[in-house]
């Protein structure tokens, strides 16, 4: 009888720890998806660079707007870039040594999407 009681207490303890963690993760993912949909394929300013997001089979990928020389476009040109749907972009899934601070800006773009409160 005591064994059954201990097993029951164990499951109650586990569910009290796991279920709130799962619901918090789901809440954050929903908030990130709402932020993604609110952007509506427009670019946002992160570290004086323009970023946008694509929803792919592997999840949400950040991409930075670049000119024809692969130099990130500054935030001062956000209106021109949002109006021009034919802008070149580089995805953040690969490291770029030719662009200083590229990885840090990509990390910040992801954190701005997922961890805004």
Swiss-Prot record:
Virion surface side: 22-117
UniProt entry keywords in alphabetical sequence: Disulfide bond, Fusion of virus membrane with host membrane, Membrane, Phosphoprotein, Signal-anchor, Transmembrane, Transmembrane helix, Viral envelope protein, Viral penetration into host cytoplasm, Virion, Virus entry into host cell
InterPro entries: Poxvirus_A21
Main subcellular location: virion
Transmembrane segments: 1-21
PTM comment: Contains two intramolecular disulfide bonds. They are created by the viral disulfide bond formation pathway, a poxvirus-specific pathway that operates on the cytoplasmic side of the MV membranes.
Membrane topology: Single-pass type III membrane protein
GO biological process: membrane fusion involved in viral entry into host cell; symbiont entry into host cell
Cell location: Virion membrane
Key word Nucleotide-binding present: no
Assigned GO CC terms: membrane; viral envelope; virion membrane
Function: Envelope protein part of the entry-fusion complex responsible for the virus membrane fusion with host cell membrane during virus entry. Also plays a role in cell-cell fusion (syncytium formation).
Oligomeric and partner information: Part of a stable entry-fusion complex (EFC) which is at least composed of proteins OPG143, OPG147, OPG155, OPG086, OPG094, OPG107, OPG104, and OPG099. Formation of the viral membrane is necessary for the assembly of the complex.
Family: Belongs to the orthopoxvirus OPG147 family.
Name listed for the protein in its UniProt record: Virion membrane protein OPG147
